[in-house]
Structures are given as structure tokens and as C-alpha cells.
């Protein structure tokens, strides 16, 4: 009897593991059954997703264009560039140190700024709360993120949930019953599939990434107005490639630095490092508070001077 019981337990364990694998909803499934080979997608020069940063971020993450380790800092970096472009924040250089002078930067925030999107409003409010009378120092935001890591984590979860709900409401995704083979049975299983509308946007996201990352299309890039590049670079930051794109622009458009909104200091390096260190501070605090496990990305590195919507 004991032997039969052991065999039964082993069979049940195997069955449960097999079921978990079969019914796992990881990865993107398109309703049309097609897949996307990202690097083979034709470059696309228009900003996808109706310029909705949150949808663009969500699709890029789900398509593994950006990994979980850097996706959060990329999104924050993208919004900082957006706010700089829109004149909502100003970043100013300052020197510190009595003997050895070191460059640092403070962020001056418009405390009365308003946004249509609730998630963008919530993110900006965190910056305001971490500031002192509208002036935000880099280390001050790191300390705030470390202390309020749960709010940071909740915000990113909310971003994903709101985007998923919006995709369902606007025809990008739907629930579909599919049948999967498990041992001798075809078992029905409800899961989210992405429609042709989402498939097209995913092609555009991949194509836009390929367009930005391509170093052999300098003539095409040179034909685009600088003010449009200021917007393109917001989305390049979300993809984590703003610094590489900027280097290309300096070659393609010799006077780019003189005419861009982002011309006063190494902005891409600053924004990325600012976001990276802040998210890392939240990650470390979350790991300490949860016994070493966290959904945040890790990493380190300091910064001090030197060179360089809604779904519709």
C-alpha cells in the first residue's frame, strides 16, 4: 500500500508540473497565430502607439526589446526627457566641494504642472514629494525611493494593469478559449491573446527600434526635423538607446546640439543615471524588506558631472 501511495504521489506531482507548464500564460500570443522576428522587421520611422509612452513601454517590454532589469529606469528616464522638453522641469548645473570642485545637477520642478494621464501625474507627484520647495537633488530622490519602495513598485504594477485594461477595451487584446493537450485530454483554457491591431503595433514598435538603432541610415535621419528628434529621443530613452541615437545625430546633423531642447549638458547620461540609481535604491530597500527577493532591478553607479496618453 505504501508503494502504491508513493507511485500515486509521484504521478500527481508530474501531472501538476505538466499542467503548470502547459497552461502557463507567459509570452505573447497573437490571435492570428503569427510570430515576430524583431530584428527582421522593416525599420519604421514614425512613433508608434499614437505616441502613448505607457503603451509603447508595455509592448516593448512584452516583446523583450527591453528586459525587466532596465525597463523601469528606462521609463522614468523617458518621462524626465519629456518633462524637460515640455519645460516642466529644468536641470541646472552646480559645483560642490571646497577644494576639489565636482559638478552636480539639481532638478527644478514646476510644482503647479498638470497632466491628463493619472499615472504620469502620480509619477510627477513622487518627484514633488521628494523635492524641497520644488528643487530635487539626485541623492534626495534616491533616499525617497529607498524609503517608499512600495509606492514605486505599486506605481509600476498600476501602469501595467491600466495598460492591459485599456488594451482589452480598445481592441488590442481579448480573452479566448484555447485547447491544450495534457496527457490523454484536450483541456479548455482561457487566456489573453493579442489581436491583429496589437500585432500591427508590435511590428511598428520593433520597426521603430530598428530604425533608431540602425547606423546605416544617417541620410534618412538627417532629413528629420530636430524638434521631432527631441520627441523621438523620449521613446529612445524608453528603449534604453537614447545615448547611442544621440551620437548618431551628432554625425547626421552637425548643428544638432545647437538647436535641440536638450543642449545644455550631458542630459541623456544624467537622466539615465538618475533613474538607474533611484530604481536601484528602491530595489535594495525592497530586497532588504523582503528577505532578499524583489521585483526591482539591481545595479549601482553614481553620477556627478563630467562629460558625456491612453490607448486609442
Feature map (PLM): residue ranges:
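Acidic, Ser/Thr/Pro-rich intrinsically disordered cytosolic tails and loops
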Residues: 1-312
